[in-house]
Amino acid sequence: MRVPLRLLLTLIIAAAIAGCGFQLRGTKSGNLPYKTMYIALPETADVRIWMERYINAAGSSEIVDDAKLADATFQQLLDSRQKTILSVNAQGRVREYRLQLNYTFRLVNQKGQVLVAPNEISLTRDITFDDSNVLAKDLEEGLLWRDMNNDLVNQIIRRL
């Protein structure tokens, strides 16, 4: 008698979750309302590479190489990355750094009309530093910048 009760309870919970529109973060289709899109960034820019991956994976929009052929053009207005000292130890050596990424973008159509007003995204990560582990901390910093780029592109795609 316990097995059918558990099964029934599981089915009720699953129906309630599905009924409220819950989706796992990675399973959303991410459909953009634009059929074609131009990304006004150099081909080697990290943000462009990550955006192309997300948009191509969603399959709802096509990335074009000419702004005249695009329904929407992504324009970067600001890309500021800073590494500042957060704290020092008693000997005056750095203990922590703060990594800051400030990014502003907008989306315009072929006529130059603004489709998405300028949006500012600010991301911050703190990293500890140790003189005896310089190489490891350098790798950790690189991973944090990469993680911040990933978060940045996720937020950009959601705002488009």
Predicted ranges, named:
Residues 8-18:
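Bacterial N-terminal signal peptides
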Residues 135-160:
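C-terminal/domain-edge helix-coil "capping" segments
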Residues 75-120, 124-142:
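Surface-exposed short loop/turn segments
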Residues 2-3, 18-60:
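A structural "domain/chain start" motif
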Residues 55, 59, 107-111, 131, ...:
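Sec/Tat-exported extracytoplasmic proteins
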Residues 61-72:
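Short acidic low-complexity segments
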Residues 1-9:
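Bacterial N-terminal signal peptides that target proteins for export
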